[in-house]
Curated annotation (Swiss-Prot):
PROSITE patterns documented for this protein: RIBOSOMAL_L20
GO biological process: ribosomal large subunit assembly; translation
Keyword terms of this UniProt record: Ribonucleoprotein, Ribosomal protein, RNA-binding, rRNA-binding
Example of a GO cellular component annotation carried by this entry: ribosome
Keyword Ribonucleoprotein: yes
Keyword ATP-binding: no
The organism's place on the tree of life at top rank: Bacteria
Biological source species: Thermoanaerobacter sp. (strain X514)
Pfam families to which the protein is assigned, alphabetical: Ribosomal_L20
Family of the protein in this entry: Belongs to the bacterial ribosomal protein bL20 family.
Function comment: Binds directly to 23S ribosomal RNA and is necessary for the in vitro assembly process of the 50S ribosomal subunit. It is not involved in the protein synthesizing functions of that subunit.
The name this protein goes by in its record: Large ribosomal subunit protein bL20
InterPro entries: Ribosomal_bL20, RIBOSOMAL_L20_CS, Ribosomal_protein_bL20_C
GO molecular function, one term: structural constituent of ribosome
Amino acid sequence: MARVKFGKVTRRRRKKILKLAKGYWGAKSKLFRVANQAVMKSLMYAYIGRKLRKRDFRRLWITRINAAARAHGISYSRFINGLKKAGIEINRKMLSEMAIHDEKAFEELVNIAKQHLNA
């Protein structure tokens, strides 16, 4: 029985890795072993980055809401608490968009939150 060396499979796998490593500097884009290590690490960083992006955007939205709420005389935590007591469930992304693009609607939400905090 003839020996099978997986020539096609190996070549395809190596070409795939080198294609992913395109644009890397020096040996990282030319040599399979070095490129494989670089690609593995970059895929790991990409995975971590996708998780971090969600945290970063949430922090950005909260910062924007806080700035807009303080401009209307209420802190972020009291504003969110007032909205919860009022039964208004708008996510932070939408609140930050409203704070930037639709100030009148945001001001109405602030007034509603203030009313429900005092009640």
